[in-house]
Swiss-Prot record:
Keywords: Acyltransferase, Amino-acid biosynthesis, Cytoplasm, Methionine biosynthesis, Transferase. This is Homoserine O-acetyltransferase. The active site is at residues 142, 235, 237. It comes from the Bacteria. Its main location: cytoplasm. Belongs to the MetA family.
Length: 305
């Protein structure tokens, strides 16, 4: 089954060219089945790029997916056209009475700020509490995952002396987890962050289980059964050239930045990077959607009851 998105959303053409099945709302209605309703709370400045990345992953399963784009109500983006935001996004305050089978909370380039100093922190806390009554399963990504694990468990983020930047090998710590079904013993994941969550603090929190971790860059994927959530601190959703774009941006700005490790062949930025994470990215998000499909009530209004 395809992903259901507006025909004029940029992701529609991108995914169609890539061979992902997409359909507009009129086509979806003719199938007469209940799609999984997935929300994307997009906190990234490059909204369209992020939409494409997540739509690609959640649209590649046999399930029909209805993707809803959500923004913070009071925060105004400066990097995406107002027309795009008005056409395709709904503010959280307008959708808070609705139910979702799944919600993705993206990262945001605000790691240097304490959580309480983020301008929309109060509303984001409201969102996270709202997931406990209105969302069947929530996936917090990078800063979004850090915010969730801090909000629900008090686990702190810590600044790194140098940016964790590159593609790092991670170990499969929970081969029996349904979220890691089909995973190899090790996988490579893009990492791009100035902060870390520490395994000792995750272990000290009640009800958390680390599923993927790295000796070099620490815990990556954490399951929180009590809050029906997954937290991932790295970037399976990244395109092949996302790390290159970040590196080139910082070089052009004169910022001190190391070449992303294990990304370019022989760590040579003059060569085209290799994508070594795509298959595991599809596995993880496909497994997440499968778990939602198996557990979510058919009557979406029954979520949270």
């Amino acid at each position: 089954m395809p992903i259901k998105i507006p025909a004029d959303l940029p992701a529609y053409d991108v995914l169609t060219r890539e061979g992902v099945m997409v359909m507009d709302p009129d086509q979806a209605a003719r199938q007469d089945i209940r799609p999984l309703r997935i929300g994307l709370l997009n906190l990234m400045p490059k909204k369209i790029q992020t939409e494409n990345q997540f739509a690609r992953l959640i649209g590649a399963t046999p399930l029909q997916i209805e993707l809803s784009l959500i923004r913070m109500s009071e925060h105004q983006t400066k990097n995406t056209a107002a027309e795009h935001m008005e056409s395709f996004y709904r503010p959280f305050q307008d959708i808070k009475s609705e139910k979702f089978d799944g919600l993705i909370i993206t990262g945001a380039p605000i790691e240097h700020l304490d959580f309480q100093d983020v301008t929309y922190w109060d509303e984001l806390r409201e969102v996270m509490d709202w997931t406990q009554t209105n969302v069947h399963s929530t996936f917090g990504v990078c800063w979004g995952g850090m915010a969730m694990i801090n909000h629900f468990h008090g686990v702190r983020k810590h600044m790194l002396e140098a940016k964790a930047f590159g593609c790092f090998r991670h170990r499969n710590l929970a081969p029996a987890s349904p979220y890691l079904r089909g995973f190899s013993d090790e996988c490579v994941i893009p990492v791009s962050r100035w902060t870390e969550m520490r395994q000792s603090e995750i272990d000290a929190a009640e009800g958390l289980k680390t599923l993927l971790g790295s000796d070099q860059v620490g815990p990556c994927l954490v399951q929180d059964k009590a809050h029906r959530a997954l937290y991932i601190f790295n970037h399976f959703e990244y395109d092949s050239e996302t790390l290159k774009q970040e590196y080139d941006r910082d070089v052009a700005a004169g910022n001190q930045i190391n070449v992303p490790l294990n990304y370019y062949p022989d760590d040579d930025p003059s060569r085209a990077p290799l994508n070594r994470w795509r298959s595991h990215a599809h596995l993880l998000y496909g497994n997440w959607l499968t778990e939602i499909y198996q557990d979510t009530p058919y009557d979406i209004d029954a979520i949270g009851r």
